[in-house]
Regions:
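Beta1-alpha1 glycine-rich phosphate/pyrophosphate-binding loop at the start
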Residues: 2-60, 65
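FAD-binding core/adjacent interface of flavoenzyme oxidoreductases
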Residues: 1-5, 28, 73-133
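Generic detector of bulky aromatic hydrophobic side chains
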Residues: 19-20, 66, 88, 122
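Generic secondary-structure signature for well-ordered alpha-helical cores
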Residues: 22-25, 67-72, 104
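Substrate-binding N-lobe of the ribokinase-like
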Residues: 53-85
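Short N-terminal micro-motifs specific to bacterial/archaeal maturation
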Residues: 49-50, 69, 93
Length: 133
C-alpha cells in the first residue's frame, strides 16, 4: 500500500512529493497537466536561475528531481476516490491504487475571459503573478 497519493503534478504536488519522500514515505503522484506554472513564460525572481527560466522547464526539472528520488509520476486522470475504513482507493481509467492518505494538489484554474487579444498577450503584458500584477 502507498503511504500518500498526490493528485496533481504541478509545483505544489511535486514539492509535496519530494518532501514526503525525504521523510521516507512511499509516494505516488498522479496528474494530467503541469499546473499553472506550465503557462508561465519567464520566471526571473527565483533563486538559482540568474537569467530566468520558463515555468514549463522549471516544473519539468521538479518532476525529474522527483523521479530521481524514486517517486513515480503518472500522467493519468483520477476519476474516483473512495474511502474504506482501512485505506483510500484512487481510481484512474486504467488503474486502482490503495493509499493511507491522499493529498489533493490540483491548484486553481484561471478563469478565461472573452477579450480580443487576451490569449495573444498572455506573458507579454498580461500576467497571472502576484508581484507582477
Amino acid at each position: 500500500m502507498i503511504d500518500t497519493i498526490i493528485i496533481g503534478k504541478g509545483a505544489a504536488g511535486i514539492t509535496a512529493a519530494i518532501y514526503l519522500k525525504r521523510y521516507n514515505k512511499n509516494v505516488l503522484v498522479i496528474g494530467k497537466d503541469l499546473g499553472a506554472l506550465e503557462k508561465t513564460v519567464k520566471i526571473e525572481n527565483y533563486y538559482g536561475f540568474p537569467t530566468g527560466i520558463d515555468g514549463k522547464e522549471l516544473i519539468q526539472n521538479g518532476i525529474t528531481q522527483a523521479k530521481h528520488l524514486g517517486i513515480d509520476v503518472y500522467d493519468e486522470e483520477v476519476v474516483q476516490i473512495d474511502n474504506t475504513l482501512e485505506y483510500f482507493l484512487v481510481t484512474t481509467p486504467n488503474h486502482e491504487y490503495k493509499a493511507k492518505t491522499v493529498l489533493i494538489a490540483t491548484g486553481k484554474k484561471r478563469s478565461p475571459i472573452n477579450v480580443k487579444g487576451f490569449k495573444h498577450l498572455q506573458g507579454k503584458g498580461i500576467s497571472f503573478c502576484v508581484t507582477c500584477d
